[in-house]
């Protein structure tokens, strides 16, 4: 994908959206406006070998302007032709008396003896944002996207879906944002800072005006509505400060960049998390500090012996009781922040605001959260203070936040992007705002079972559900509020169904469908039906999920609901995974994640066999240079090498992390069976397996034995796939059969 800069016919083709066409009032018939400092240029872009123009919903196709070098040109389509002159408006619709073909205006631009096929697409229903870099050559989009910390400035214009001007002025900063969305995907999310506070979402509330906003790429979300839907559902459920958002078409230095979600940033500020700004108090208490980023950090431990990091050299304001905004995050990410602390259960929380905490403030907030965690782990009562967990955390917000995380099946629940805030002068924390749902609702890469408890099976969730008062609160809110919102609004087939901010899935999809179609062409996301499929899949998921949760008694959940989230009970290998787990042969990647599709490694297989043998005592250090002591696999690898189940390499390595094939797994199991004295005679591999000759010579006996004993079967009725990866679910089935047959 690149901006087209061909010199064919000396063409420089751009669509000029004239300022009059974008004014709040519709232009008078026949009126055109000369470009001025509100004109926005959109470049022709090459995508997949085709040239495309992506226009915003406010584009007037009866008064488009092409700018190009050279003599007047012509546009042709369907045997029709219209003349165009650079800088002069023309009526594109004259080429299409019957309308465009499937929403795409395909024409040929002819100039002199050259011609260029062009496809033009137009958005609908949503606004558009135009970002123009102050220095596009040195600090344009490519510079901003090189490193997340790179910052640039420029101007920004935001046009509403109705053509009204919402903002046109200074963009004091644009930079990258996000974690996996920044590193893993080509479509980058941004944070922008305006020159003045503005209510970009036009809520009508002056308190919603702000300088800082985020642009979420939602690259992983095929429907593009998951974040908006969830934010609005949380708002309807009564969670304060749930982010407001709106989809827009983004143009950056003349290039269309796709559908983005213009969203409020999760921060302490008016119109956001509207509590006292303790960060401002720290700034007032330290007037000599010019740049807080320059202050050094130090680490310490609180009264519970848990590590934290704080900023040194800060004077405390008079009151450090709030407000705080905390986020549970992965330890690796937390360590990159200025102020964070760990809990007694090994989890990390970052102070998002204040970003720079003194040691006293860190002691205070980390201690408050730790007392809450201790209370939850002790059945709801802190064993030292005697206080209830609800003395430390607001029950209503915690129960409502939990339900949003659970209904959406958010894989980050209580691991990352889970926020708490604490107002000044209050004794307790509050849960929220909710955040980051672009891979929720069945879209998580772990492929959770639809009927699995997710938020309630992670970190603090499971302990909370063991407390009767929490389960009862969740049950009441679901039965009396959330179920009604889901049934009456979210799943309503009417696109007009709405309650406050919350709309139906059909309504959200209708709003964004034309823009998302352009986005999918730009980013090569699926085919023409991808949005329809995503919409139907989402509705079906929410319907199934709601039905399942409605049947649960949250105050008395059975143990089965806490099974591996990614191993559905209706899948064929469920019984095998359950068998090897209960036998102690396998364990999950985490307490509730099995990752059945992950490939087994040499260390994993050695460990399973070691457990099969009863985990015998191992004397002496590992014989391999790459197997240090005190690793989870150290004893298993040393044992496996000692009895001849697994060999090392000539250079002294074992390579514990190397992924193995099906024939390698079977060979290790075959050697173990021989070690135990089992009968190793076997028939040849049956001829029905057409790929039996692809079994390596060194693995033929092992495969023949495993097939003969019924320990392994084919990946299809006619294929053994000996050189295919040995996945965890396959290995679970193999070891179950072995244990039942020979164990």
Language-model features, listed with the residues they occupy:
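Middle-to-C-terminal accessory/interaction subdomains
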Residues: 181, 334-338, 344-415, 421-562
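Conserved oxyanion/phosphate-binding beta-strand-loop segments in alpha/beta enzyme cores
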Residues: 157-217, 358
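Bacterial N-terminal signal peptides
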Residues: 9-19
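Short, well-structured beta-strand/strand-turn elements
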Residues: 73-75, 237-249, 410, 588, ...
């Amino acid at each position: 994908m690149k901006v087209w800069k061909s010199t064919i016919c000396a063409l420089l083709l751009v669509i000029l959206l004239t300022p009059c066409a974008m004014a709040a009032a519709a232009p008078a018939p026949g009126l055109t406006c000369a470009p001025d400092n509100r004109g926005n240029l959109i470049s022709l872009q090459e995508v997949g070998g085709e040239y495309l123009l992506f226009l915003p919903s406010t584009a007037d196709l009866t008064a488009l302007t092409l700018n190009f070098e050279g003599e007047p040109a012509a546009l042709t389509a369907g045997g029709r032709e219209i003349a165009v002159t650079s800088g002069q408006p023309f009526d594109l619709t004259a080429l299409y008396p019957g309308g465009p073909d499937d929403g795409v205006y395909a024409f040929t631009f002819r100039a002199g003896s050259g011609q260029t096929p062009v496809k033009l697409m137009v958005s609908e229903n949503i606004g558009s944002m135009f970002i123009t870099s102050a220095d596009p050559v040195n600090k344009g989009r490519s510079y901003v996207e090189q490193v997340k910390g790179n910052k640039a400035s420029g101007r920004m214009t935001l046009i509403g879906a109705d053509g009204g001007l919402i903002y046109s002025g200074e963009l004091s900063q644009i930079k990258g944002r996000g974690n996996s969305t920044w590193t893993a995907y080509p479509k980058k999310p941004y944070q922008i800072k305006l020159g003045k506070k503005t209510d970009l979402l036009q809520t009508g509330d002056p308190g919603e005006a702000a300088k800082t906003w985020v642009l979420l790429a939602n690259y992983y979300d095929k429907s593009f509505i998951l974040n908006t839907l969830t934010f609005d559902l949380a708002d309807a459920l009564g969670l304060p400060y749930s982010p407001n958002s709106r989809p827009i078409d983004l143009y950056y230095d003349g290039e269309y960049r796709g559908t983005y979600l213009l969203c409020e940033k999760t921060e302490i500020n008016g119109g956001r998390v509207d509590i006292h700004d303790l960060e401002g108090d720290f700034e007032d208490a330290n007037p000599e500090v010019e740049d807080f980023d320059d202050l050094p950090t130090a680490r310490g431990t609180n009264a519970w012996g848990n590590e934290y990091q704080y900023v040194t050299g800060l004077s405390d304001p008079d009151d450090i009781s709030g407000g705080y905004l905390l986020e549970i995050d992965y330890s690796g990410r937390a360590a990159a922040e200025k102020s964070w602390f760990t809990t007694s259960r090994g989890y990390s929380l970052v102070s998002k605001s204040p970003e720079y905490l003194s040691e006293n403030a860190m002691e205070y907030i980390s201690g408050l959260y730790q007392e809450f965690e201790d209370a939850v782990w002790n059945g709801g009562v802190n064993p030292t203070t005697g206080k209830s967990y609800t003395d430390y955390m607001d029950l209503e917000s915690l129960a409502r936040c939990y339900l949003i995380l659970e209904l959406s099946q958010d894989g980050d629940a209580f691991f990352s992007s889970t926020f708490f805030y604490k107002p000044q002068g209050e004794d307790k924390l509050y849960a929220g705002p909710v955040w980051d749902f672009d891979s929720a609702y069945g879209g998580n890469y772990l492929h959770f079972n639809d009927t699995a408890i997710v938020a309630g099976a992670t970190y603090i969730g499971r302990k909370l559900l063991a407390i009767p008062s929490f389960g009862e609160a969740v049950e009441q809110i679901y039965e009396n509020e959330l179920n009604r919102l889901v049934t009456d609004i979210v799943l309503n087939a009417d696109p007009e169904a709405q309650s406050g901010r919350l709309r139906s899935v059909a309504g959200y999809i209708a709003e964004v469908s034309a823009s998302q179609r352009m986005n999918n062409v730009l980013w090569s996301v699926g085919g023409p039906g991808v949005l329809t499929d995503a919409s139907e899949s989402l509705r079906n998921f929410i319907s199934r999920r709601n039905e399942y949760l409605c049947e649960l008694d949250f105050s008395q959940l059975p143990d089965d609901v806490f099974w591996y989230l990614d191993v559905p009970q209706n899948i064929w290998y469920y019984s095998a995974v359950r068998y090897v787990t209960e036998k102690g042969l396998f364990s999950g990647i985490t307490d509730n994640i099995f990752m059945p599709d992950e490939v087994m490694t040499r260390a994993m297989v050695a460990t399973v066999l070691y457990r099969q043998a009863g985990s015998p005592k191992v004397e002496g250090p590992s014989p391999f240079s790459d197997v240090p002591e005190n690793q989870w696999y150290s004893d298993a690898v040393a044992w496996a090498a000692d009895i001849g189940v697994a060999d090392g390499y000539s250079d002294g390595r074992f390579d514990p992390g190397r992924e193995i094939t099906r024939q390698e797994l079977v060979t290790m199991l075959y050697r173990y069976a021989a070690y135990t004295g089992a009968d190793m005679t076997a028939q040849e591999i049956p001829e029905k397996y057409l790929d039996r000759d692809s079994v390596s010579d060194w693995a033929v006996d092992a495969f023949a034995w495993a097939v003969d004993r019924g320990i392994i079967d084919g990946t299809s009725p006619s294929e053994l796939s000996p050189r295919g990866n040995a996945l965890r679910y396959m290995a679970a089935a193999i070891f179950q059969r072995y244990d039942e047959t020979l164990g």
